[in-house]
């Protein structure tokens, strides 16, 4: 008998992966956590039936959420990561010797524990001495912080369930306050393709625009996320990622599977239908 993992992207669209075995299934105080093993995508884990990370394509997401802001401002030293319980975002950040401190705030400790056991590919740098783990609500955490971070990365789940509060005007305003005068905020911005995800994307973009003077959106192709077309938000008090001297990033000699400085320039060139959505967020 064949075992398939099937995820509902809309009420009329489903995405399936053939599974060899289910490695873990459990429920925390916040969500259901499942880990599967597959031939095509390796080990992958889901939260409440939604894909979070696969061994095969996680490099795309983590490259793009980390290296775009790091190339824009190579002097980043103090970073806050909200969410990111799989550890992949922290893994990429620890590759920068110039970063002195990484605070990671994850609401669900069980996510981290499960990923440490089943996804060492992403979780293998959570014990880096520069990393401090806080198992609490990121929304509450940023309320008490002011003028502290050079970069905040919001590596959250979708804008419903435990991650819902990370898409509010209050949250983005508190992130602005928590950043230094030249600080950068990057967040996963959902997909523009399916209607429900596009609504979440437009709502997030509208609220970020109300807080930050520099506000851009960039994209990547992530095969296991709904539609495969995924967006990221880039907001800053000072730096425009299209005007920064990003070629200096190449001097670091970091080996990446997805990100490069040519792609950095190109990923901000959006399709017309996405441009129109972003232009009309106030309607």
UniProtKB/Swiss-Prot annotation:
UniProt-listed Pfam families: Spermine_synt_N, Spermine_synth
Protein's cellular compartments: Cytoplasm
Main subcellular location of this protein, as a coarse class: cytoplasm
Record bears the keyword Zinc: no
Reaction(s) catalysed (UniProt annotation): S-adenosyl 3-(methylsulfanyl)propylamine + putrescine = S-methyl-5'-thioadenosine + spermidine + H(+)
Keywords, ordered alphabetically: Cytoplasm, Polyamine biosynthesis, Spermidine biosynthesis, Transferase
GO MF annotation list: spermidine synthase activity
Annotated S-methyl-5'-thioadenosine binding sites: 31, 106, 137-138, 162
Domain PABS: 2-237
Catalytic site positions: 155
Ligand binding (spermidine): 62, 86, 155-158
EC number, as in UniProt: 2.5.1.16
Pathway membership: Amine and polyamine biosynthesis; spermidine biosynthesis; spermidine from putrescine: step 1/1
Top-level taxon of origin: Bacteria
Function according to Swiss-Prot or TrEMBL: Catalyzes the irreversible transfer of a propylamine group from the amino donor S-adenosylmethioninamine (decarboxy-AdoMet) to putrescine (1,4-diaminobutane) to yield spermidine.
Subunit and interaction comment: Homodimer or homotetramer.
Protein name as annotated: Polyamine aminopropyltransferase
Organism: Clostridium perfringens (strain 13 / Type A)
Gene that specifies this protein: speE
């Amino acid at each position: 008998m064949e075992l398939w993992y099937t995820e509902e992207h809309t009420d009329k669209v489903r995405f399936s992966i053939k599974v060899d075995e289910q490695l873990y299934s459990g429920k925390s105080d916040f969500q259901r956590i499942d880990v599967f093993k597959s031939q095509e995508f390796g080990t992958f884990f889901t939260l409440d039936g939604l894909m979070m990370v696969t061994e095969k394509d996680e490099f795309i997401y983590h490259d793009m959420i980390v290296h775009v802001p790091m190339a824009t401002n190579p002097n980043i030293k103090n970073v806050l990561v909200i969410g990111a319980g799989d550890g992949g975002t922290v893994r990429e950040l620890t590759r920068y010797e110039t970063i002195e401190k990484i605070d990671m705030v994850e609401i669900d400790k069980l996510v981290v524990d499960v990923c440490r056991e089943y996804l060492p590919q992403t979780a293998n740098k959570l014990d880096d001495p520069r990393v401090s783990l806080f198992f609490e609500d990121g929304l509450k955490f940023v309320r008490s912080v002011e003028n502290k971070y050079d970069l905040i990365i919001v590596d959250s789940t979708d804008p419903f369930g435990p991650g819902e509060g990370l898409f509010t005007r209050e949250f983005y305003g508190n992130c602005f306050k928590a950043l230094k005068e030249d600080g950068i905020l990057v967040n996963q911005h959902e997909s523009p393709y399916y209607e429900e995800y596009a609504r979440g994307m437009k709502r997030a973009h509208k609220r970020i625009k109300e807080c930050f003077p520099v506000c851009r959106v960039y994209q990547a192709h992530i095969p296991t996320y709904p539609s495969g077309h995924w967006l990221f938000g880039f907001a800053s008090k000072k730096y425009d990622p299209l005007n920064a001297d990003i070629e200096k990033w190449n001097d670091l000699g970091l080996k990446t599977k997805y990100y490069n400085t040519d792609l950095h320039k190109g990923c901000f060139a959006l399709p017309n239908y996405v441009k129109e959505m972003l232009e009309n967020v106030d309607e």
